[in-house]
Amino acid sequence: MAETTVEQPVEETEVVDIESYTTESEVPVEGEYTSESVASRFGEPQPAAGLGRRKNAIARVRIVPGTGKWKINGRTLEDYFPNKVHQQEVNEPFKVLELEGRYDVIARISGGGVSGQAGALRLGVARALNEADVDNNRGALKKAGFLKRDDRAVERKKAGLKKARKAPQYSKR
């Protein structure tokens, strides 16, 4: 059995006047935020945690609302990573989100070398920031590629070769 539907008449008071809107209304362009809009855009900072891995390094990261202090294995960022390149790499997620100085970072890092540890810490910080506010942070972090684990690792040495791929010198005679 087919039912017939009765169409309800649309009242003219419910129709919104589209002509009152313009495309030239003042809205901040993506990436252009003032200091006042950062607080309103993110609200109150929330504590969060994240785990990062790179090569053989593992970083367990906690971020808590604060003033931007870093504690890595009980040492400051400058003491733990004296190289400015590694300091900048670790700080990139905060720069992309314009959240520098809003969180204190407490991290435990083990294994690997300096470069691997910096990469692991960056991934851990990015995951913690993502967990703190998924709605506002995830898009920018994904676009920058900070939420993706870099799974490249050292290739193992093979039997009969000097290194992973380097063969001993070949002599024809």
Curated annotation (Swiss-Prot):
Q: Name one GO cellular component term.
A: small ribosomal subunit
Q: Does the record's keyword annotation contain Ribosomal protein?
A: yes
Q: Which family does it belong to?
A: Belongs to the universal ribosomal protein uS9 family.
Q: NCBIfam families annotated for this entry?
A: PRK00132.1
Keywords for the protein's UniProt record, in alphabetical order = Ribonucleoprotein, Ribosomal protein
**Which Gene Ontology terms describe the biological processes this protein takes part in?**
translation
Q: Which domain of life is it from?
A: Bacteria
Could you tell me which InterPro entries the record lists for this protein? Answer: Ribosomal_Su5_D2-typ_SF (IPR020568), Ribosomal_uS9 (IPR000754), Ribosomal_uS9_bac/plastid (IPR023035), Ribosomal_uS9_CS (IPR020574), Ribsml_uS5_D2-typ_fold_subgr (IPR014721)
Entry keyword annotation includes Protease? no
Example of a GO MF term: RNA binding
Q: Where is this region: Disordered?
A: 20-53
What protein name applies here?
Answer: Small ribosomal subunit protein uS9
Q: Which Pfam families match?
A: Ribosomal_S9
